[in-house]
Amino acid sequence: DYEKKGVIVQGITGSYGSLHAKQMIAYGTNVVAGVTPGKGGQKFEGTVPIYNSMQEAVNATNAKISIIFVPAKFFLGAAKDALNSGIKLLVAIPEHVPIRDTMEALDLAKQKGAVIIGPNTPGIMIPELIKIGIMPPMPFKAGKIAVLSKSGTLLYEISDALTNAGFGQSITIGIGGDPVN
């Protein structure tokens, strides 16, 4: 039932966040809210409510999944906001996150019983069902093989080769290319 799970997009009003939020919605991902401090009360694309904090967004939607599209220097604050609000799966797109910030976020996630994918991940995709990240949909086809990779490009290439050979993917996960993830 992953297609029904709500996803919150942190940084939804930024250029990168808005571009990929639109693509995630077009793919079928259930984006239930966005978070950008100072932009609460607005709507993204006329339908997705924007909140000032993750706690407000989680209270309104009961979502357990979030994706972060903020610059690396704001990652730790965004991760803490998400994890302290009850998020259980956090997809961290920013690259070059300071190692100390990543370690602190991972420690908090462990304390909260949550998982962080990334930083510097292309995200997670269940082909033909949901996309939480920046992956292009073309290389992927639904099937039975799970693909995990530290490199986003290799993830796409492996999935494309499998697809072209007639083998689909059950899930694809980019674990993140930063030194610690």
What are these regions (language model features)?
Residues D1-N181:
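Catalytic-core regions of core metabolic enzymes
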